[in-house]
Amino acid sequence: MSEENNSQNSNPPNPENGEIASEIQKLQEQAEKFKNDYLYLRAEFENYKRNAIKERSELMKYGGERLVRDLLEVVDNFDRALSVNVSAENFNTFKQGVDMTAQELKSLLQRHNVIEIPAHGAPFDPSVHEALSSEATDQMAPGHIVRVFKKPYKLHDKVIRPGQVVVAKKPE
């Protein structure tokens, strides 16, 4: 009877047990691979974030470098103009040089997408203009700009400086 109990207690080799163990081993290896892949991608993403922050910081710090370099050329021209002793004989040449430098500055601003917004005679627009006062006149339609103290400018499509203007109103 003891032999019967021994044979009943000891399980005969079951082919399913080997398959299950093999399947468990495969799943553990696959889980380890997924974990390693995850850790690698996480580290790669952290590096990406760090680089993106660094690039953004450098862009913020040095983004205007090209504009500044171009502006320095204009500053040099104004410095040369200011060093000239202006007399009646050279006034026209001096004025022409200053006009050319002013045109160079306007051209530079346009190259950098800083655009003057036409104001004189245009309808008043509070998103573009700041009304300093109003003036009674029959020379301009009411609500239109009679005088401009500061021209409005935009960078791309954003107003970066509203114009300071005087708005026409009906004479009384």
Curated annotation (Swiss-Prot):
Participates actively in the response to hyperosmotic and heat shock by preventing the aggregation of stress-denatured proteins, in association with DnaK and GrpE. It is the nucleotide exchange factor for DnaK and may function as a thermosensor. Unfolded proteins bind initially to DnaJ; upon interaction with the DnaJ-bound protein, DnaK hydrolyzes its bound ATP, resulting in the formation of a stable complex. GrpE releases ADP from DnaK; ATP binding to DnaK triggers the release of the substrate protein, thus completing the reaction cycle. The gene is grpE. The keyword Kinase does not apply. It comes from the Bacteria. HAMAP family: GrpE. Belongs to the GrpE family. The lineage of its organism: Bacteria, Pseudomonadati, Bdellovibrionota, Bdellovibrionia, Bdellovibrionales. InterPro entries: GrpE, GrpE_coiled_coil, GrpE_head. It is found in: Cytoplasm. Keywords: Chaperone, Cytoplasm, Stress response. One of its GO terms (biological process) is protein folding. Pfam families: GrpE. Residues 1-11 have a biased composition (Low complexity). One of its GO terms (molecular function) is unfolded protein binding. It comes from Bdellovibrio bacteriovorus (strain ATCC 15356 / DSM 50701 / NCIMB 9529 / HD100). Disulfide bonds: none annotated. Residues 1-22 are annotated as: Disordered. Homodimer. One of its GO terms (cellular component) is cytoplasm. This is Protein GrpE.
